[in-house]
Amino acid sequence: MKRFGALILFSLLAGCSVTSGEYGAIDSCLSAGQAWNYRTGKCERTAEGSVDLIRVDKSAHLMSVYRGGQLVREFRVALGRGGQEPKMQQGDGRVPEGTYRIVSHNPNSAFHLSLRIGYPTAEQVAAAARRGVNPGGDIMIHGLPNKKGWIGAKHTTVDWTDGCVAVTNTEMDWLYKAVPDGTRIEITS
């Protein structure tokens, strides 16, 4: 947790391409239960109902959710502190790549709420065994650390997770309701 706070503070002091006013607009939009469109920079009404596909583009720091092939909503995300390479072993701080399923909802997460991603696959377990390493696990889509929700959209200024995909708590509230267990998730670089 101390590392998370230090990274956020450093990134805020160092400056970034998004202004304080823009973060305020994003947080106000999300707090009103609406969706921030990162492409247009506008607040929009969000579609109701469940989604059937999640796509995470690691290089763009963007998570998109779909229903019936139609884009429903996009989220700016923070990723693993270990860089853009695919997850290879436990503790590397990287986000895995591949196609998975959401396997469970966790209402008691240390990060507001979370959705467990079905990593590792049998193939990833076998590949890790051949390398003589543990593939790791506990990969989630989650909110901000408990009692740190005030950070809001600013959390995306730095990759701070241990290999998970992080969104704001308000965004996580929406995802938690809209994403059923079994939903396919594709993670690419």
Tell where the protein language model's regions lie, with residue ranges:
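Sec-dependent signal peptide recognition
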Residues: 2-9
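C-terminal motif of bacterial Sec signal peptides marking the signal peptidase cleavage site
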Residues: 14-15
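Bacterial lipoprotein signal-peptidase II cleavage site
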Residues: 18-24
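Disulfide-braced loops of extracellular cysteine-rich modules
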Residues: 25-30
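Extracellular, cysteine-rich, disulfide-stabilized repeat modules with beta-strand cores
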Residues: 34-38
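N-terminal post-signal-peptidase region of extra-cytosolic proteins
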Residues: 44-53, 58-59, 79-103, 122-127, ...
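Exported/periplasmic cell-wall-interacting domains
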Residues: 50, 96, 104-189
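Short Gly/aromatic-enriched secondary-structure transition segments
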Residues: 70-82
